[in-house]
């Protein structure tokens, strides 16, 4: 989906997604001291806004102007603020080393564009910073519930680690993978609980 399609999807009074953070975000950042955080492909802002409520100085970037506007409204409703930018995560020029935490949640792109987005994230990551990515895993297509039904935009752990390594070499960084694996996510439906399968990768920048 392009920016126009997402603008149409987000053009509702209500949030398309819940206003609460993704279930994996709070536990994965629980041990970090709040600093500056970047949410690439922030959508309606639920993760960025939650980080702001926890004391982070947040910047949210998304190519949907409608999504960005809703993120700003959600922040206002929650009594927090942030910097909200309409831009494409694959080619946005981020402040080099400007963020202590960079997150990408469910940015489902073909391989070349996904690799570019991960490079953007790594270029923005400060020394001693943390990168966290969660995405719909390829295995979800055959064994999980929901998510895109196009294998070309689904991920594997190996895909993301390859993207990270590519960015590490290209940018001359030293990165350490702290966590990389598939994780299950329970989804409530009218028919009962179902299980979605996600990719989760967390990386620390050493230098």
Model features per residue range: what roles?
Residues 1-32, 139:
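Conserved class I S-adenosyl-L-methionine
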Residues 93-101:
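A short acidic, Gly/Pro-enriched loop at the edge of an enzyme's catalytic core
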Residues 100-114:
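A short SAM/SAH-binding and catalytic strip from SAM-dependent methyltransferases
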Residues 115-127:
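A short glycine-rich, Lys/Arg-flanked "PGG" loop and its adjoining helix->strand segment in the class I
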Residues 128-136:
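Conserved beta-strand signature within the Rossmann-like core of class I S-adenosyl-L-methionine
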Residues 152-172:
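Short alpha-helix
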């Amino acid at each position: 989906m392009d920016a126009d399609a997402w603008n149409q999807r987000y053009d509702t009074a209500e949030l398309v997604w819940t206003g609460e953070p993704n279930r994996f975000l709070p536990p994965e950042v629980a041990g970090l001291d709040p600093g500056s955080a970047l949410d690439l492909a922030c959508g309606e802002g639920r993760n960025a806004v939650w980080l702001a409520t926890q004391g982070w100085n947040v910047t949210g970037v998304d190519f949907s102007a409608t999504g960005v506007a809703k993120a700003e409204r959600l922040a206002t409703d929650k009594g927090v603020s942030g910097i909200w930018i309409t831009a494409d995560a694959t080619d946005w020029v981020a402040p080099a080393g400007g963020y202590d935490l960079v997150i990408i949640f469910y940015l489902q792109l073909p391989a070349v564009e996904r690799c570019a987005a991960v490079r953007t994230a790594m270029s923005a990551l400060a020394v001693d910073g943390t990168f966290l990515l969660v995405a719909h895993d390829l295995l979800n297509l055959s064994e999980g519930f929901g998510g895109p039904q196009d294998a070309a935009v689904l991920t594997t752990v190996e895909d993301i680690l390859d993207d990270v390594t590519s960015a590490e070499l290209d940018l001359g960084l030293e990165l350490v993978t702290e966590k990389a694996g598939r994780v299950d996510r329970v989804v409530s439906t009218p028919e009962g609980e179902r299980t979605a399968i996600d990719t989760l990768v967390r990386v620390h920048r050493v230098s």
